[in-house]
Amino acid sequence: MKKYNIKTTDVELLKKWYYLMTLGRALDEKAPAYLLQSLGWSFHAPYAGHDGIQLAIGQVFTKGEDFLFPYYRDMLTALSAGMTAEELILNGISKATDPGSGGRHMSNHFAKPEWHIENISSATGTHDLHAAGVARAMVYYDHKGVVITSHGESASSEGFVYEAVNGASLERLPVIFVWQDNGYGISVPKKDQTAARKVADNFSGFKNLKIIHCNGKDVFDSMNAMTEAREYALLNRNPVIVHANCVRIGSHSNSDKDTLYRDENELAYVKEADPLLKFRRMLLRYKRLTEEELKEIEEKAKKDLAAANRKALTAPDPDPKTIFNYVLPEPYEPEKYKDGTHRETEGEKKFFVTAVNETLKAEFRHNPNTFIWGQDVANRDKGGVFNVTKGMQQEFGEARVFSAPIAEDYIVGTANGMSRFDPKIRVVIEGAEFADYFWPAVEQYVECTHEYWRSNGQFVPNVTLRLASGGYIGGGLYHSQNLEGALATLPGARIVCPSFADDAAGLLRTSIRSRGFTLFIEPKALYNSVEAATIVPDDFEVPFGKARIRREGSDLSIITYGNTTHFCLNVAERLEKEGSWSVEVIDIRSLIPLDKETIYESVKKTSKALIVHEDKVFGGFGGEIAASIGTDLFRYLDAPVQRVGSTFTPVGFNPILERAILPGADRIFEAAKKLLEY
């Protein structure tokens, strides 16, 4: 391994480093002025004191081979990796030509996705999971490269950082985790954050994990550490933690005031420890550069920054008319089954669970770049809790079908990451054994929904998230929950919930073939339900945003999905027998996008609407449907829009309690009858 030191490092390289460090520091010090002039950069986290390690990260990053996930303090990292001062300013003042997000993401979040300098979240540490996912793809496709992910030491207190390090060690992934340790998490000192003085030592027991400690204030020690880390990760296909000891010369950010929690002695110490001043003195002391040469470099950096500033200030602002661009990508459009229906009457009916299993296998054959993982999905004789993935690992191998740790963040986050490696990749994940246990991964769900919009259309995670959802199985509080009402509030995800086997197959096929992120809800009570079993054409497809009229009628429109579709069909039949009422039942199938056209045409015809779903009435998705009908179709209504759903309580385990809480046929019947008689 090449070793860097003050005596033997090439002079031209030293000049380059000093230029980058001087330019970076000048911009770091100038950034607050933009806010004072009302030009932007309302969030700025100064990096001064992290100079050595940030220079080294960028210098070691190899464009075309590596992926880099910098965090919000990584200004010099981005410069050192090849981004220009102008590009950094464009991000800082949120211009339309910001290469990372087009002015959509927060200032001080530097990115250039075309170089695989990734656009990351403000929730520091979440990107470690994405890094592990990219590294998994590198291993599978035998790609020569590493993934570098960077953040402060305090982020290691987050559970998802632990999950990323554990997973990368378990899978032997070439990830370099760089922890820039300045001793503080905003105002919280390290002693209140972690048990070990050196944070990386908390992870010293991990098999396959190498830990390198370095002085992040020193250019040469940092360069040697990062060079060693990259060479080790490449050669051994193992993860590395580079723990860099830094100082934070300024406040955490422009909204922080460090004099409220740091004394004068500490403030004097960190200023004296300034890495840029030390590097300058070292260059002079060892006579590698003269005072004149250093001043020439400083003058060039000053002029270059002024030019970059002038150019960036003339860049266009984002167009507010574009806010709806890149919320969701264009989906796969079925060609044969354009309306998502079929007329097959010959053949054997298939259970819901069989339809999902067979469709997964068919799509894995269709696209060899399709992968699936989750909890319990790949045991020899078992494919998940409900055997949905049974037989898949045997056919497609352990590299494409495998069980994940019981770590929901890791399951979702690595799916986001792996899909970054190549847009051809499609990832299907079982986000949790039951939807009830998915809540720890909501942060990663948010990341998946934001990516396309936040990156200004440069990246979208091609991920289908499967969740076994709902009740009616006597599961109690933690095997009966519905998540769609809460998750539907987050733009950037398609949400589908089939009620029958054929729709499960068709929607799953469309989800996997589409670009973008889809939440695929599987009502687990329907897996082996005779009522949900149907004939399923081998190539069946269902487009997003296309409802299905399950029963035609003229007196009342019932709008439903999932488990309650079957109750509603039974109720419609009962109402016809008992009162000669003609009830139309619409199975929306797709919540986002929602087929308002079909719903509206039905309500215009019947003039009465009842919305039924298993989720709670309060805060449930039906409220959005009801509001839309009330707003857009008020003049057509002969009665108030009504809703039926679960009570605003958890779901009880005793069957008596479950029946009282979840909507059933009798409750739906009474609501429908009351509405019909209105």
What are these regions (language model features)?
Residues 55, 115-310, 314, 379-459, ...:
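Thiamine diphosphate
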Residues 70-72, 111, 125, 150-151, ...:
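Short beta-strand segments
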Residues 34-39, 105-121, 144-150, 207-211, ...:
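Glycine/charged-rich beta-loop-alpha catalytic/anionic-binding loops adjacent to active sites
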Residues 26-173, 178, 189-207, 477-478:
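Cofactor-binding active-site loop characterized by glycine-rich and histidine/acidic residues
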